[in-house]
From Swiss-Prot:
Pfam families: MAGE (PF01454), MAGE_N (PF12440)
Domain of life: Eukaryota
SMART domains xrefs: MAGE, MAGE_N
Transmembrane segments annotated in the record for this chain: none
The organism of origin for this protein: Homo sapiens (Human)
Residue spans of biased composition, Low complexity class: 316-333
Protein name: Melanoma-associated antigen B18
Family annotation (InterPro entries): MAGE (IPR037445), MAGE_N (IPR021072), MAGE_WH1 (IPR041898), MAGE_WH2 (IPR041899), MHD_dom (IPR002190)
Keywords: Cytoplasm, Tumor antigen, Ubl conjugation pathway
Single Gene Ontology BP annotation: negative regulation of transcription by RNA polymerase II
Location of region: Interaction with LNX1: 100-343
Length: 343
């Protein structure tokens, strides 16, 4: 290709890119102007489309329609919050308006499609490329690719506890990474390919915010708000009651026990030893804060408790390292002494 034509082609590509960036900025500004926050909403999926071709755009499930309404999703009971209190009617009205605004945003239909596309890729462990996302989902809205991918990634993070990251910036390949140090997903069978870290993190958050022990009904109340019901099979989590009261208990991430002296018997959830070992109160609080679109310090008492927990963990790690070093030195001296006596 002649040099002049190459220059014109590059100039045309730059103009197209600038036009796309301006459109993305305009879309974001319009969203804010309408009163809808562009920050992540907690996306729990409703009914999964049956045999959905990747190229189709599904209708927005009921559970998605209220996606922005997250401020009361995991309401602190034991932990006081700095956020201003308002009446329940005002909150409900605001949530309804947010839900309507979310549905009216045309980009969110693409977000829903992309989330389902990513779930299919996760289940089949097929490579994820920018080209495929544009070809099968984004299509004519490729100018908004970055914004759509950002929203979909945030929903995947909060719902499933996984991060979507670009691993090959040249060929634009993407891959999923576990957000936390939890190893629960490594223990699942081949049939259970969807991670349940998000469900576990919700439960751990409810427990922590309820003074480190949460009544069973309080946990299910939160789950219900997010479209997860104990007596209804969920297409991501399967049998939620079994996952919560058996699977996660057997794996020692949760403890499920009868409330002492309760008659009729009532049950409660606590953190299991594996949860204490593999995550921390600060990580869980950060997860909860992200759901609320705020910062951990917005929950002062829980934040202080999480800071104390972090300090204790730091001291424990330092003590463990010191003990390991002392043992190594002792073995070294013993070996050296034995060698000297042998001479």
């Amino acid at each position: 290709m002649p040099r002049g034509q190459k220059s014109k082609l590059r100039a045309r590509e730059k103009r197209h890119q600038a036009r796309c960036e301006n459109q993305d900025l305009g879309a974001t500004q319009a969203t804010v102007a309408e009163g809808e926050s562009p920050s992540p909403a907690y996306l729990l999926f409703g009914d999964r489309p049956q045999n959905l071709p990747a190229a189709e755009t599904p209708s927005i499930p009921e559970a998605l329609q209220g996606a922005p309404s997250t401020t009361n999703a995991i309401a602190p009971v034991s932990c006081s919050s700095n956020e201003g209190a308002s009446s329940q009617d005002e909150k409900s009205l605001g949530s309804s308006r947010e839900a309507e605004g979310w549905k009216e945003d045309p980009l969110n239909k693409k977000v829903v499609s992309l989330v389902h596309f990513l779930l299919q890729k996760y289940e089949t462990k097929e490579p994820i490329t920018k080209g495929d996302m544009i070809k099968f989902v984004i299509r004519k809205d490729k100018c908004h690719f970055n914004e759509i991918l950002k929203r979909a990634s945030e929903h995947m993070e909060l719902a499933l506890g996984v991060d979507l990251k670009e691993v090959d910036p040249i060929r634009h390949y993407y891959a999923f990474f576990s957000k936390l140090d939890l190893t629960y997903d490594e223990t699942t069978s081949d049939e259970e390919k969807i991670p349940k870290t998000g469900l576990l993190m919700i439960a751990l958050g409810v427990i922590f915010l309820n003074g480190n022990r949460a009544p069973e009904e309080a946990v299910w109340e939160i789950m219900n708000m997010m479209g997860v019901y104990a007596d209804r099979k969920h297409f991501l989590y399967g049998d939620p009651r079994k996952v919560m009261t058996k699977d996660l208990v057997q794996l020692k991430y949760l403890e499920y026990q009868q409330v002492p002296n309760s008659d009729p018997p009532r049950y409660e959830f606590l953190w299991g030893p594996r949860a204490h070992a593999e995550t921390s109160k600060m990580k869980v609080l950060e997860f909860v804060a992200k759901i609320h679109d705020t910062v951990p310090s917005a929950f002062p008492s829980c934040y202080e408790e999480a800071l104390r927990d972090e300090e204790q963990r730091t001291q424990a790690r330092a003590a463990a390292r010191a003990h390991t070093a002392a043992m190594a030195n002792a073995r070294s001296r013993t070996t050296s002494s034995s060698f000297s006596h042998a001479k």
